[in-house]
Amino acid sequence: MGRVRTKTVKKSSRQVIEKYYSRMTLDFHTNKKILEEVAIIPSKRLRNKIAGFSTHLMKRIQKGPVRGISLKLQEEERERRMDFVPDESAIKTDEIKVDKETLEMLASLGMSDTPGISAVEPQQAMAPIAAFGGGRAPRRY
């Protein structure tokens, strides 16, 4: 079973990653040396825990955005995705295929002359598959 990480370890490693993301790597020993240089951590054991969690978070960041860590790269990527406008609309309304009943409903509403609506024969539903048991007699308990 894994160990529980304290709030101190989690908060401090998130802060270190936000400030020194460009220097952090996926290697524990490198991250430990970076922490030694950039932060004043009272004990070796706490430094190792923070370095370990920072390494863990760096691996998660490689896979995708991580909650609680705001990186400039991720913010720019999110902005780019939000501002994206597709060349062609995903909702094409050039032609709408409807069945006879729907056409009648549109006619009753006075919308039968709407452009792009065409009638299509409804597809037949498949016959239901035999019930459980494959046609055998019911179980006797």
UniProtKB/Swiss-Prot annotation:
Pfam families named in the record:
Ribosomal_S17e (PF00833)
Which Gene3D superfamilies does the annotation name? Ribosomal protein S17e-like (1.10.60.20)
Q: Which UniProt keywords apply?
A: Ribonucleoprotein, Ribosomal protein
Which PROSITE patterns does the record associate with it?
RIBOSOMAL_S17E
What GO biological process term is on the record, naming one? translation
Membrane spanning stretches: none
- Cellular component GO terms, alphabetically? plasma membrane; ribonucleoprotein complex; ribosome
Looking up InterPro entries in the UniProt record yields:
Ribosomal_eS17, Ribosomal_eS17_CS, Ribosomal_eS17_sf
GO function term, MF aspect, one: structural constituent of ribosome
UniProt keyword Ribonucleoprotein present: yes
Q: Which family does it belong to?
A: Belongs to the eukaryotic ribosomal protein eS17 family.
What is the name attached to this protein's record?
Small ribosomal subunit protein eS17w
The organism named in the record is: Arabidopsis thaliana
Gene encoding it? RPS17D
